[in-house]
Amino acid sequence: NTECKKIVWKISFILIGAKNRVKNLKLYAEKNNIKADLYLSIESGINNSLGRWMITNIAVIEDNFDFESYGTSPSFPVPDRLAEDVIRTDLSQVMDKVLGEDKERHNQKGGIQLLTHNKVTRVDLTEMAFIMALTKYINGDTWK
């Protein structure tokens, strides 16, 4: 765990992943002659940008004029003792090991459903990230 604390996992790494997804989506759409007004992506990951290990979702929305907006979901903490395992594998595998395998968690509900006792799901976190990303679009020039 000492080795893990030396590593700085910035939230920008998650943003880069989400931006790459949008870039690839736009390329796919162009290659397959698919027209869209907006291109959306979401990326989830672990970071310690606040000095604590957290899982955060970042949504990126880009239009055809390369105007981009992004938003984040609420983040939730990862215990220090589990952070290194999450970095080496992924959150789902660590949760399987700690909480037991659960097919519901691997579908729409996500591990956050278990951690919040059914108060929040993966869909909720994804929705919040996209709503935050949409603020630049729904407010026009006022918020750009």
What residue spans do the PLM features occupy?
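Anionic-ligand binding patches
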Residues: 5-144
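Glycine-rich phosphate/diphosphate-binding loop of Rossmann-like nucleotide-binding domains
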Residues: 1
